[in-house]
Amino acid sequence: QDAYRFLXTHTYG
């Protein structure tokens, strides 16, 4: 479930 967190942090701008 690390992919979900990566996406969330990658699309924060």
From Swiss-Prot:
Q: Which GO terms describe its cellular component?
A: extracellular region
> Which key words tag this protein in UniProt?
Cell wall, Secreted
Give the highest taxon in the source lineage.
Eukaryota
Compartments annotated for it: namely:
Secreted, Cell wall
Identification of the protein by name: 45 kDa cell wall protein
Organism of this sequence: Nicotiana tabacum (Common tobacco)
